[in-house]
Amino acid sequence: NDDVYASLDFDGYHIDQVGDRGNVYDYYGSKLNLVDGFASFIKKMKMRQLNKSLVMNAVANFGSQQIAGTRDVDFLYSELWSGESAFSDLLSIMKTNQSYNDSLAQVYAAYMDYNSSKSEFNTPGVLLTDAVMFAIGADHLELGDHMLCNEYFPNSNLKMSDALKTAIVHYYDFFTAYENILRDKGTQNYDAIYSGNSSVIINNWPPKLNTVTAYTKEVNGKEIIHLLNFVKANSLSWRDLDGSMPEPETINSLSLGVRASSVKKIWVASPDCYGGAPQELHFRQQGDYVAFTVPSLKYWTMIVIEK
């Protein structure tokens, strides 16, 4: 560790592991507690180089509590596999990990189209997964020299289409522009959201097929509603293993009713249109409820209600 930093000006160290291997033993036949070993290893590395950053991969969340509990890593980092393949897992894992250390953000290593034999990533699958991750406040480790499709990072069998290259920039611009709204701590809200369109069902988190799923959070006095389009989705797995997630149809002029009083302003923004720029909406206050119309929803539209 010291020799590496003496020769190379790295910012820090990425510590990896291979996940839960059941009972393991040392050379002398004594049983090992790997997760406790992770924590002591991190702490000793930090003590030797206090100014260097550390992160450790919790493969399938193995050891995540011990890793986070050291408070010596820069963020919560989980590599997800088949046991954590549901969209709903993305929020539950993040909440669990942040219960161990609520000062750190969650980053997922999550490989898209893992079993696909195609030559390109499936754009709808990638964008829907990123939409969900970003909406809940997590990040996706997916870009380097190329987009990752495999735990072996040099694997570049799948390429990004021109459409995906363009869209992914909009998504990361959006995530950066609105990071305080997306990442600041808040309280999840489960109040019903009423649709004025009989053909569109609004479903509160967790995601459900054939619906628009809403993830709602109170952040710094604002009510933030993320609309996620699962109307045409063919699976509730973020992995899109064979690259078959269909492109959603854009829903235009979606009338909604939300429980919210003393509303001062409502605006929407989406990485799918207008470069993520905010659009202020007209609204109608009716007692404890407010009615308004969302201009469009493709993958993800964020609604901000200011009170």
Can you say where each PLM-predicted feature lies in the sequence?
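Solvent-exposed beta-hairpin/edge-strand motifs
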Residues: I251-G276
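Aromatic/acidic polysaccharide-binding cleft in carbohydrate-active enzymes
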Residues: Q17, Q98-N189, V219, V231
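A cross-family glycoside hydrolase active-site/sugar-binding cleft signature
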Residues: H14-D16, V55-V59, E79, V107-Y111, ...
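Acidic-and-aromatic substrate-binding clefts and catalytic sites of carbohydrate-active enzymes
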Residues: A60-Q66, L80-L90, Y114-T123, C149-E151, ...
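C-terminal beta-strand-rich structural cap/linker in extracellular carbohydrate-active enzymes
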Residues: Q285-K307
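Conserved, mostly hydrophobic/aromatic
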Residues: D16, D74, M133, I225, ...
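Carbohydrate-binding surface patches
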Residues: V200-A260, T301
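Active-site neighborhood of glycoside hydrolase catalytic domains
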Residues: N1-F75, W81-S92
